[in-house]
């Protein structure tokens, strides 16, 4: 009986210990970002043969929109209603053919695009991810490609638009980068 009691105590102690350990394991909520542009209608300045405008928002990163001629070319997405947004992703053709310069505009009507919410002139990424410092709202989102690297036509697999809680990270300042002012007498 004594052996049985010790076994029960050992099992209970182990169970309680495991419960404490397991309760310390962090649990992360899965966050999913909804692509506001998914399956929405795209309008474009030009399209080439078997690479039509609908490929830009079809959710398939194996189909693409392409133009026969080079920049400046544009595509705008009608989201169907006004949304807040702050993150944009563009999936360009490949590592040697991508937009090196582009602008993104957001509007509630097709007549007044205003100033771009983002202008990029130094892109070197096949997947361009842009996060704004603050959210903007609108029904229409326009991607204007002004320069391409590689082949001259514009070629993009997907244009994704998100409303996310992500924040732009502040730059990290290093004390070694800060200099004291020089005093002169």
Protein language model features and the residues they cover:
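Disordered, acidic Ser/Thr/Pro-rich linker "stalks" and the adjacent N-terminal cap
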Residues: 27-80, 93-98, 151, 160-185
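Exposed beta-strand and adjacent loop surfaces of beta-rich binding modules
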Residues: 39, 85, 99-103
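Beta-strand-rich structural segments
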Residues: 87-90
